[in-house]
A protein has these predicted regions:
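Metal-dependent catalytic cores of enzymes that make or break cyclic nucleotides
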Residues: 162-265
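Two-component/phosphorelay signaling modules centered on CheY-like receiver
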Residues: 22-41
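Receiver (REC) domain active-site loop signature in two-component systems and cognate sites
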Residues: 66, 104
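C-terminal output helix
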Residues: 116-126, 130
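Active-site beta3 strand of CheY-like receiver
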Residues: 55-61
Length: 265
């Protein structure tokens, strides 16, 4: 467990929701868990779902056989709701049928406890499940942070490359940025996904990167180009393609550079 996950786990008292139509079982679970956890109880599946509209426990202990909604019906409802789906669920039952245990795990429960349970084992399995859940959340947070850092770095590199082209061709200064900006706005209005918009933005920024391979005196020439010079200019699409084709994570970059002067008509 990472330090940040451990610190978080120890800085708050996690909440456990116990769902069982037996008051004896909910009382027993509350006594065992009460020292280390905030314990909420519900005597039916319906009450459980109603309670979850305002509460978000770290773990749900769910009885399988209850009047009205049984445990499987409750679990299905939990997993179909984006707000409750991430909450880990441990099934509790006096049924020692292996098929019940297999079904519960297949349908999304993280563990299965047979009643009557041994207090020490019961407490340890609850603790392990909550710690694992907190660790997974912490890891996901770290992944998201690193992903955002990578995206930021990637965009900075792309801006630097497009800036290099602009520095060489002062007649079209800011051209690549404007192309990227207008392209992503068109994509947004067409209903493209956020990821597709980001990809199109990158293609716009780097579509002219091949001009790096064109001689500066040709790019900056303010008189008519010779046939040879014009041919040299046209080759910037191929140069750009060769520069960007190694970026296999986003093949659209190379495609955009290679064909951005082609016309559909």
């Amino acid at each position: 467990m990472t330090n940040s996950a451990r610190d978080f786990a120890t800085s708050i008292k996690p909440t456990v929701l116990v769902v069982d139509d037996s008051t004896m079982m909910t009382s027993l679970a509350a006594r065992i868990l009460g020292k280390d956890y905030n314990v909420l109880t519900a005597s039916s599946g319906e009450e459980c779902l109603e309670l979850l509209k305002t509460k978000k426990p770290h773990l749900i202990l769910l009885d399988v056989t209850m009047k009205g909604m049984d445990g499987f019906a409750v679990l299905k409802a939990l997993k179909s709701n984006a707000k409750t789906a991430p909450i880990p669920v441990i099934f509790m039952t006096s049924d020692e049928n292996n098929e019940t245990e297999i079904r519960s795990l297949n349908e999304g429960a993280v563990d299965f406890i047979t009643k009557p349970f041994i207090p020490g084992i019961f407490l340890r399995r609850v603790k392990n499940t909550i710690e694992l859940s907190l660790l997974q959340k912490n890891l996901q947070f770290e992944v998201n942070v690193q992903t955002e850092k990578f995206k930021k770095l990637t965009r900075q590199i792309m801006l630097a490359l497009s800036g290099t082209v602009d520095a060489k061709d002062h007649y079209t200064k800011g051209h690549s940025f404007r192309v990227a900006k207008y392209s992503v706005e068109i994509a947004r209005r067409l209903g493209y996904s956020e990821q597709n918009q980001e990809d199109i933005y990158a293609m716009g920024l780097l579509h002219d990167v091949g001009k790096i391979g064109v001689a500066g005196d040709i790019i900056r020439k303010d008189t008519k180009l010779t046939d040879e010079e014009y041919q040299n200019i046209k080759e910037h699409t191929i140069t750009g393609y060769n520069i960007l084709k190694t970026i296999t994570a986003l093949p659209g970059l190379a495609i955009g550079a290679r064909w951005h002067h082609e016309r559909f008509d």
